[in-house]
């Protein structure tokens, strides 16, 4: 498969389609080969040992004394996936100094636990948000840290859309990294509450992507795409990635399609 870029074409990937139930199971299980087809009990044991590995290998090496606080820190991060990362708020919730939280964030990022999606603010003015958005590299690990007991429960939690968005962003990111390509991924949000979940830069154009758990995509879901028009930015074709069983056009250059159609 090639690095994912919205092409404006209906027919795309060669992955077999999956139901929403199957999709939530994959998001809940995560993408580690050890748990992908395994039982909830074995999944629990695996993530427990994974956490232990992170702590022993990375945390102790960097001199973190309070391991339970670091676990709490990761759990707080997991509860905030898909949100703008606000260091002070996270530090306050964990009960540690802001500088400590900053150091721990750096460890979590360098260990490959989290991914920070940078904001886009090139030539758009001073009204855009300039904090990164927080994602976990594995949604299964995040769901485990949040103690979400099953795929069905995950599909019903208040922030299920954030878990779905996290999963989609990671799958798209992997399509670039596995092809040896440098991904130029951003998100857009301004103080007028306009938001574009993901912008992919292909070297000349920025391709806007909206991510929704809906199975019936509507044109109104992509109205924020117009935010980057009229600036010096060249906008490319876009996509709405969702749970729709069938791809369809939402405009002349925006296609709604499944995550399994990338």
Task: Describe each PLM feature range.
Residues 168, 172, 196-215, 238:
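Conserved catalytic cores of phosphodiester-cleaving nucleases, focusing on short active-site segments
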Residues 182-196, 200-202:
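Active-site metal-binding core of divalent-cation-utilizing nuclease and nuclease-like domains
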Residues 144, 218-220, 247-251:
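Switch/connector loops and helix/strand junctions flanking conserved nucleotide-binding motifs
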Residues 4, 244-262:
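Domain-level recognition of nuclease-like catalytic cores that cleave nucleotide substrates
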Residues 215-225:
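Active-site-adjacent loop/helix micro-motif of nuclease/hydrolase catalytic cores
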Residues 2-171, 175-177, 183:
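Interdomain hinge/linker elements that couple catalytic modules in large macromolecular machines
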Residues 236-242:
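Short, hydrophobic beta-strand segments that form beta-sheet elements in well-ordered domains
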Residues 177-178, 227-235:
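Arginine/glycine-rich "motif VI" loop of SF2 helicases in the C-terminal RecA-like domain
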């Amino acid at each position: 498969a090639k690095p994912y870029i919205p092409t404006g074409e209906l027919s795309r990937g060669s992955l077999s389609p999956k139901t929403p139930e199957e999709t939530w199971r994959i998001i809940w299980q995560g993408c580690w080969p050890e748990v992908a087809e395994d039982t909830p009990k074995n999944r629990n044991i695996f993530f427990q040992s994974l956490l232990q590995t992170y702590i022993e290998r990375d945390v102790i090496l960097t001199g973190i004394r309070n391991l339970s606080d670091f676990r709490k820190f990761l759990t707080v991060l997991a509860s905030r996936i898909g949100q703008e990362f606000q260091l002070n708020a996270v530090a306050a919730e964990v009960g540690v100094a802001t500088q400590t939280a900053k150091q721990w964030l750096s460890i979590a990022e360098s260990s490959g636990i989290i991914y920070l999606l940078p904001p886009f603010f090139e030539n758009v003015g001073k009204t855009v948000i300039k904090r990164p958005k927080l994602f976990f590299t594995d949604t299964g690990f995040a769901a485990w840290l949040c103690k979400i007991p099953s795929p069905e429960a995950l599909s019903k939690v208040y922030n299920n859309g954030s878990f779905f968005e996290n999963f989609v962003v990671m799958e798209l990111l992997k399509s670039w990294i596995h092809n040896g390509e440098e991904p130029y991924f951003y998100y857009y949000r301004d103080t007028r509450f306009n938001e574009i979940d993901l912008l992919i830069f292909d070297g000349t154009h920025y391709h806007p992507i909206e991510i929704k758990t809906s199975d019936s995509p509507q044109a109104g879901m992509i109205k924020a795409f117009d935010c980057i028009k009229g600036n010096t930015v060249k906008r490319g074709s876009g996509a709405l990635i969702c749970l729709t069983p069938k791809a369809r056009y939402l405009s002349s250059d925006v296609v709604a399609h499944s995550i399994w159609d990338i």
